[in-house]
Regions:
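Bacterial N-terminal signal peptides that target proteins for export
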Residues: 2-17
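Protease-labile, long low-complexity intrinsically disordered regions enriched in Pro/Ser/Thr
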Residues: 34-181
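C-terminal motif of bacterial Sec signal peptides marking the signal peptidase cleavage site
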Residues: 28-29
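Short intrinsically disordered, low-complexity segments
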Residues: 6-10, 23, 32
Length: 181
């Protein structure tokens, strides 16, 4: 007995084989353990409001500091910390990502409220709670200078301060003005 395949049958077999191989690869890739980031503590000046950033891999930056197994990022009054540290990649548990205000040299106040949306409502303008908004990694790239700068950025303030962009500034302008790239 001879089995013959027509061209449409052959294409179906190849397509199914490709789909099976792709699915197998995807499942294998997704089954790897997810890289966990180190704990991070961001310490801001007492009354700081606005955008703040950590720019990584800066030779003239601050060396990485640790406190109780957590990376310490002390944000200066201009809102931008330059650090020699490499960016920590991976996922981080919410309880390992903490934000503080330095009220006195000995006293930190933790900011626990996170605002996850920027919906502009009348209620937002009535809320006087201090929030951390946004956050996440970014990369500034300059192809002419062959330069990539990794950073993390956030905002701190009441909802109205965040919506009104109080002390908001563009990190790209900061990088260019300070010739970091």
């Amino acid at each position: 007995m001879t089995t013959t395949f027509t061209l449409p049958d052959f294409k179906s077999i190849v397509l199914c084989s490709f789909a099976t191989a792709l699915l197998s690869y995807s499942l294998t890739a997704c089954s790897d353990t997810v890289q966990q980031r180190e704990a991070e503590h961001y310490i801001l000046p007492a009354n700081y409001v606005g955008a703040f950033y950590v720019i990584f891999d800066q030779a003239s930056g601050e060396p990485l500091q640790y406190q109780a197994d957590a990376r310490q990022y002390r944000i200066p009054t201009n809102g931008v910390l330059l650090t020699q540290a490499r960016i920590s990649e991976g996922v981080i548990a919410a309880d390992k990502l903490r934000f503080f205000r330095q009220d006195t040299p000995e006293q930190l106040t933790e900011i626990t409220a996170r605002w996850l949306t920027s919906i502009d409502t009348a209620q937002a303008y009535q809320d006087n709670t201090t929030y951390i908004f946004g956050g996440g990694p970014g990369v500034y790239s300059n192809s002419e200078l062959k330069c990539d700068i990794h950073f993390r950025g956030f905002h701190i303030g009441t909802k109205s301060q965040i919506l009104d962009e109080v002390n908001h500034f563009d990190i790209e302008s900061f990088i260019q003005q300070n010739k970091l790239c």
